[in-house]
Structures are given as C-alpha cells and as structure tokens.
Amino acid sequence: DNFSTRYLVNAASKKLSVPLISASAIGFQGQLLMVDADSACYECLFPKEQHDNEGLRCAESGVLATTPVMIASLQAHHTLLFLGLNLSPLKSKLLLWDGLTLKQRILHFEKDTNCPICQASLSVN
C-alpha cells in the first residue's frame, strides 16, 4: 500500500542483485512480478515520474479479503519454485489476476533503457 517503499525495495534489490518477487492487491485484482539482476525492474514497468503516489490505495478503495490471500499464495508458490527449483516463470513478466472472473493474464515487459535503477545497477555490478 506504500508506493515509496515499493520503489526503495526495487532499487535495493537491483543494487544488491537480490531477487524480488513483488505482489500487490486492490479491490478484486492483484499483480505479481519478479525482478532479478538481469531482468527488467519494477520501475521499468511503473516509471516513478509517471506514477501518481496518491493513486489507488486499499484504505480508500477497499480490497476483498480473499484477494490478498490469492495473490500471497501465488507469490509463495513462485518463491518456492525459484528457491527450490531455480525456476523463474515470471522473470520480466507481470501476472494480473482478476478475482471477478477468476482469470489471469501474463504480460511480458522489457527493460527500459532510460530506467535510472537499471542504469545504476549496471555501474555497480
């Protein structure tokens, strides 16, 4: 529910080359993505300068109690795949889950060549 923290954790993940499996939920919808040293990052997908930090928040918009449970389950499953089998099916992909239709979509996204986080991690690594 805190976009500033999402951007800070993303930057730390890239700088330290520590994988990040990020999840979020609002209303009936959820998102899940994975960031690692070689992949596109959270800021590539959601550029900070284009993001309205006063956007949707669960406190104002609400969230169905089961939505975070579903997204957390997907996040835990993906984490176990990564840690146990070294699989990362969501690397540079965004999983969108819709709790009204019970459908999910997976969108591929590329590194943004102008992303300040990815550029900074190149100079560190």
Show where each model-derived region lies:
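Glycine-rich phosphate/adenylate-binding loop
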Residues: 1-125
